[in-house]
UniProtKB/Swiss-Prot annotation:
Localization, UniProt: Cell projection, Cilium; Cytoplasm, Cytoskeleton, Microtubule organizing center, Centrosome
Superkingdom of this protein's organism: Eukaryota
Gene name of the encoded protein: Cfap184
Chain residue ranges for the region called Disordered: 1-243
Family label: Belongs to the CFAP184 family.
PANTHER family: COILED-COIL DOMAIN-CONTAINING PROTEIN 113-RELATED, COILED-COIL DOMAIN-CONTAINING PROTEIN 96
Coiled-coil intervals, chain numbering: 317-470, 530-561
Basic and acidic residues composition bias: residue spans: 1-18, 42-57, 67-82, 189-232
Acidic residues bias: start-end ranges: 119-146
InterPro entries referenced in this protein's UniProt entry, alphabetically: CC_domain-Cilium_Assoc, CCDC113/CCDC96_CC
Subunit field text: Forms a complex with CFAP263; the interaction is required for functional activity in cilia.
Keyword Coiled coil annotated: yes
Organism: Mus musculus
Entry annotated with the keyword Coiled coil: yes
Identification of the protein by name: Cilia- and flagella-associated protein 184
């Protein structure tokens, strides 16, 4: 009966978790388009989603903030739809900028340390962060059914909640925020938180009464303590199952969040590059307008627009700085929340392990007492070994059961997710299913025609392939024949090369003999003179005859000249003598 009760209780807890996740899926499954505005969200989210609150701000965040973003791996990035264009980014920003208003909707709870005097605003913010962390931790404890000791409720709960709402409320007019749709969200969340707190108070009171009743019954009826211990063992077994399941769920969720974190980092870098590109375009346009204004001083139409544009630019810069500050505050708050949740999870795990060890020790003690009373064969050592084997087998079966239950819960969650998506698609496509069916039939016919055409083309290609295969085989045969012929030609070429080499050697030797004979011929021709040269000899004879004739003529001319010279001298003598006889 106890195990059956534990199974029913585990199923109820799984259904509560699935219902909570269905709310998140229902909100995130709606497309962020102008056709589906933000007012259509049916219910506010009970849990904060940090990514939706700061997705638009990450577009203008500098690159140096990436080191800060890496520290927040545990932040829930689920159900974030990144817009593909700047227009889609604006619409997504309109839808997402409303999410931080629903963050402080849960009822805060303070720790005993928060009773110290708050002197600074920073201390107050830290206390508020701790209150929010404890509140979310209490929601998880309600699902597990654990009983805890809680401090008293703080008196300034509403005041801190208002501060948290004012800190997360986007007060900047960057995007159009629909406040009418988000107005009833905090009230419903507050009512839900109050109901959960009342339920926890009643459970704690029942737990304390149950413990007192058990203590009194143990004092009055010590024999019934063993049965109660067995029931307690079954409940701790169920508690161990829920803790293992929660641990596996947290590990799986952490892996998914890390993957989403890396994908969002890539998107953030892309938007940063796009932001730099837009800033460069703005700079170029402003510079061009400045050059045009300097080139055309007479045109004063652009002068009244420049102050307005400067004011708008400064206003947007101030908005950007405020958004960055708000993002830094939100990031610090989420980091603090993650640290607190990790610490609480570690405490839960240690407490669960401690209780499980104590429960195993108690079972071991009870079994040893029972087996000792039965006086089993082998004595105490054999009984101890048998008990250890049974406990090891029990641990193995518990692990297998927890894994199977976790898989069952995951399948149920995926089923709910798909059902919500199908319902959303049916709501969107209501009234258009018949038209879609007709269009699909037409498309199916066109696709069938295309398939037939493709089949015909495939047959043609197959015939071409067969013909090409035959051609390739023929070419291969011809290639092999040409290879053999080429090898024969290469052998012949090698023989011809050898003959050419021998001929070259003979040619060099004959050239050397020719050169030597030519030199000898030149020497002999120099020695023999005009021997064997008839033309030269004839010419020489003619020249000799001409020289002899010219020499004879020269001798005759010399004699004639000498006779003329003697006659001239005689004439001159006669003239001189005649002059002497002439009278002066």
């Amino acid at each position: 009966m106890d195990s059956h009760y534990g199974d029913i209780e585990g199923k109820d807890r799984a259904e509560e978790g699935l219902a909570r996740q269905s709310l998140e899926i229902k909100v995130s499954s709606e497309p962020l388009t102008p056709a589906n505005p933000v007012e259509q969200e049916p219910e506010p989210k009970p849990e904060p989603e940090p990514t939706q609150g700061r997705e638009p701000e990450s577009e203008t965040q500098p690159v140096s903030d990436s080191s800060k973003a890496k520290d927040s791996e545990g932040i829930d990035y689920a159900h974030v739809e990144v817009p593909e264009s700047p227009g889609a980014a604006e619409t997504a920003g309109e839808a997402v900028s409303r999410e931080p208003e629903s963050l402080p909707q849960t009822q805060p709870k303070t720790k005993p340390e928060s009773k110290e005097p708050e002197d600074k605003d920073e201390d107050e913010d830290e206390d508020e962060d701790e209150d929010e962390d404890e509140d979310e931790d209490e929601d998880e404890d309600e699902d597990e059914g654990e009983e805890r000791d809680r401090p008293e409720k703080p008196k300034g709960k509403g005041k801190r909640e208002k501060r948290k709402e004012s800190r997360f409320r986007p007060s900047l007019p960057l995007t159009t925020i629909v406040e009418e749709g988000a107005a009833p969200g905090p009230q419903a969340a507050k009512e839900k938180a109050r109901e959960s707190l009342k339920k926890r108070d009643s459970e704690e009171i029942e737990g304390t009464d149950r413990e007192r009743h058990k203590s009194t019954e143990e004092q009055l009826h010590p024999g019934e303590a063993k049965e109660e211990e067995k029931q307690k063992g079954a409940s701790t077994e169920e508690f161990e199952w829920t803790a293992d399941m929660q641990k596996l769920q947290e590990q799986q969720l952490r892996g998914e969040l890390v993957e989403q974190y890396h994908s969002l980092l890539v998107e953030r870098n892309r938007y940063q590059r796009y932001n730099m590109y837009l800033q460069q375009k703005i700079h170029e346009t402003l510079r061009k307008k400045g050059l045009e204004a300097a080139a055309e001083p007479g045109d004063k139409s652009a002068e009244p627009e420049s102050p307005e544009k400067e004011q708008a630019y400064l206003r947007y810069l101030a908005m950007l700085e405020e958004l960055k500050k708000q993002e830094a505050d939100d990031l610090e708050w989420y980091r603090q929340e993650v640290r607190e949740l990790k610490q609480q999870c570690q405490e839960k795990q240690t407490r669960v392990e401690k209780e499980w060890r104590r429960f195993q020790a108690l079972k071991k003690q009870v079994v040893m007492q029972v087996m000792g009373s039965c006086r089993t064969r082998g004595g105490r050592q054999a009984a101890l070994r048998e008990v250890e084997q049974l406990q090891a087998l029990e641990d193995k079966k518990e692990k297998e059961m927890s894994a199977v239950r976790l898989e069952n819960v995951q399948l149920k969650q995926s089923l709910v997710h798909f059902e919500t998506r199908m319902k959303a698609q049916e709501d969107l496509a209501e009234g258009l299913l018949l038209i879609d069916f007709e269009q699909l039939k037409i498309e199916n016919q066109t696709f069938n025609e295309k398939v037939e055409e493709r089949n015909e083309e495939l047959l043609k290609l197959r015939t071409k392939v067969t013909s090409n295969v035959q051609i390739i085989t023929h070419v291969k045969e011809k290639l092999s024949f040409i290879d053999t012929e080429n090898s024969c030609k290469k052998a012949q070429l090698s023989e011809v090369d050898a003959q050419v080499a021998l001929g070259r050697d003979l040619l060099t030797k004959t050239k050397q003999a020719r050169d030597s004979l030519r030199i000898d011929n030149v020497k002999l021709s120099q020695k023999c003179g005009l021997l064997g040269k008839e033309s030269l000899l004839r010419d020489l004879e003619e020249k000799v005859e001409k020289t002899e004739m010219l020499n004879r003529r020269l001798e005759s001319l010399k004699r004639h000249h000498a006779g003329l010279a003697l006659s001239c001298k005689g004439v001159k003598q006669k003239i001189r003598e005649a002059k002497t006889f002439l009278p002066s």
